[in-house]
Amino acid sequence: MQTFTSPIISTTFAILILVVATVRASVNASESQVEQDWITVALSEAHSMLLHVTLKGKNRKIHGQSVFDVYANPVVSADNTNIHYDAFSSFIQGDTKFTYMFVNGTSYMVESLASDNISSNWQALHCLPSIIPFEHIFPALNNATIVPSASVRGEPVDCPGGSLFQTSFSGVDFVLCVSSGSGFTAYGLDVTMTAKYLPGPTRYTLPALVEEAAPCPVVTTPEPVAPTAIAILTGRSLPPSSSRNLRTAAHAAIEADTCECMSTPRPCIFLHGLGNPNEEAELQDTPKLTKEKFGDIGDHAPCCTTVKYAVLNTVDIGWTNETLQQKFCDFSLSMSETSDLTSRTISDTIVVTHSMGGLVLASALATGKCKLAASTSWVSMSAPTMGSMAGDFLQDICDGELTDVVSKVMDLVGQCPVSIAKKSTYYQNGKYSTPELNAAYTAAQGAYRSNVHAALCSKSYNGVLSKYYPSCLVGGTVIPHKSKENDALVEFQSCLGGLDPDMFGDSYLDRFYSAKLNHADTAFLTHDGLFRDSQKPFKWFECLL
């Protein structure tokens, strides 16, 4: 179930972790005086940087842009022993400008009007929690090794007049070409970042938080960093003692890890969840008419001989509606010529459901409207098999309760009055549920356990950065979920449907995937994370069957 209608609010500094995080020079009595002097001078001459970022690979865009710039300014302590980098980047999409800042270890997003013709000073500042594994930054830089040559996706990395390094950050490999005095370039499978040293800092202004707001949390703190890291950040040559101790490795090759279909290729049908007001009699080739209730799986479906998307009204009709269940069955039966219309058996098909779509199919199976042959695989994401507290919460709001938080959550959970579909997802055995709804949940859970081939259930609303991220952050924290393990709308325990949680793992290679993704991420509306295996929904589907 999902109702995302908020403005676009997104970006990522995750690809910039090699340069825009806080660092502290490690100076202690055991170091030589020469090295101490070198560190002091190097930090005193630290440059501001222009970071030109190019995103590559599948589903790699921020606000629709795969190329953008980030500015990073060094902040050096008075004694030249401590340094951190502040950074910012701006994106314009539609009528809104989004500026992302990393200042004094704290992440912010500033939302403002993009048009100069609009006479308004409106802007809003949002705190962003840590979604970058900062604890791995410094080991990555400190452990960088010199390599004689390198390649990415089989293409050689050219580094004329510079030095090549290889390192790994949170399991992701990078090659760095460092040119003294001019900057460096970091190469990865999904990103290339060129850092150019600037003669002076770039100015920016951080808006003040509203008076009643709590201060934004610090998401990273200084940690020791070795001369190798300082040399990469500042463009200086290493001191002789560090140069002698620097390890050298063999050729560095970063190769793409792709998955091929491991089973019989079959047609795939995608059945969306709650919140789409549109209805189409025919299956669609794209999910455009689903009102962002499903994203495009694109070329992440090696086992799909064809891909179709159903477009059904899931605002005025809830998951217990027999007509809606019948449509789910009819569309699924139409995908393969081997399906048996007489026995209503869906054969040789991959059925993919998201959110309330999983409940619709489970209830259709439980009530005998259709059944799945052994040759059919049902893949479920974020199914609220016990309901969602979002429905109960919206009902509280519409009844006049919780008025102080209405503006924060209405874009996420929906509007008053509560829709029929939203009412159908009242939490099982909750104050708004009924005996009939409770019984329907129990029956659907049994069918779910007996038939689902693979499932993605999330333990965190802190997913990948996207336009849906801030609203999901609100949903995960403001909605009174019964568990902190939720994707903003659906709890992990609700998604389990009675399955053993020990079946689930946090790698995209696990058939039952315990992810850290928000509700939009699990609908393929965003993209894979760059670093964590627990944040790769597209890769999970690509490698699943």
Each model region followed by its residue ranges:
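Active-site catalytic motif of lipid deacylating hydrolases and related acyltransferases
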Residues: 254-349, 400-402
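An acidic-aromatic
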Residues: 69-136
